């Protein structure tokens, strides 16, 4: 049996300080055949978590300590046409540039000291995390990890 306690939290935050990514993951799965993702993630301010999504599963996030924002986005896709001098030639070649941007639609503040403990991120939602102070979160998702 494993206990998630203050000693573990302190150790994970210390490891995150030594990690160039300013975060440290702790896998809670119990066997290689486990088909879920359960982990603790120690996150420090200025860590960069790219905007991403999980197409086939919701994600549950519980903040054990610290303060952070889960930020949800809409994906905005546009197509830029070529410059006017090459327009006709490019039209024939279907040479448009696809441009993807993300527009913030929701910000969920997590801070256990303020009784704001967690959130559930919907399947397919684009999201990231912005860390305000050193934090440790519990994350859970269906399915095995795919890099």
Which functions belong to the PLM regions below?
Residues 40-55:
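Conserved short histidine dyad/triad with adjacent acidic residue
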Residues 40, 60, 128:
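Short, surface-exposed charged micro-motifs
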